[in-house]
Amino acid sequence: MADTVLFEFLHTEMVAELWAHDPDPGPGGQKMSLSVLEGMGFRVGQALGERLPRETLAFREELDVLKFLCKDLWVAVFQKQMDSLRTNHQGTYVLQDNSFPLLLPMASGLQYLEEAPKFLAFTCGLLRGALYTLGIESVVTASVAALPVCKFQVVIPKS
């Protein structure tokens, strides 16, 4: 329980610090801050991707890796499993969390939807870093239609 609170507090402070110097950054400044958060998440995802699958058998398919992310990685970071995983079986996966912990503290009003991307960049990097460590290049994006529901889209280009 304490580690969850500490992680959420640390994440909130990282976001606040990156936006503190310029509360209303232009598109370039906001893009840079999102990139920094995504980079931090990528490095954490790499470390977790190395450490967590030690007890797991080798992954046979991409889908097995994504199931690992939805179950084991999500539990390790957020103490809950991802709510759903969907795929088109062509390299696109949609992971949905109906009560994403980093968005729960935000009010559910529409005015807060524009603030949501800065609270999702770290997690996009986390997923991309874990996938990279497990041998899968990917592009991860996030979207929020209604708080605190969040969808992460993972696109794995076919080589």
From Swiss-Prot:
It is found in: Golgi apparatus, cis-Golgi network; Endoplasmic reticulum. Keywords: Endoplasmic reticulum, ER-Golgi transport, Golgi apparatus, Phosphoprotein, Transport. GO terms for cellular component: cis-Golgi network; cytoplasm; cytosol; endoplasmic reticulum; trans-Golgi network; TRAPP complex; TRAPPIII protein complex. One of its GO terms (biological process) is endoplasmic reticulum to Golgi vesicle-mediated transport. The keyword RNA-binding does not apply. The keyword Iron-sulfur does not apply. InterPro entries: NO_sig/Golgi_transp_ligand-bd, TRAPP_component, TRAPPC6/Trs33. Its main location: Golgi. May play a role in vesicular transport during the biogenesis of melanosomes. Belongs to the TRAPP small subunits family. BET3 subfamily. Part of the multisubunit transport protein particle (TRAPP) complex. Heterodimer with TRAPPC3. The heterodimer TRAPPC3-TRAPPC6A interacts with TRAPPC2L. Interacts with TRAPPC2L. This is Trafficking protein particle complex subunit 6A. It comes from Homo sapiens. The lineage of its organism: Eukaryota, Metazoa, Chordata, Craniata, Vertebrata.
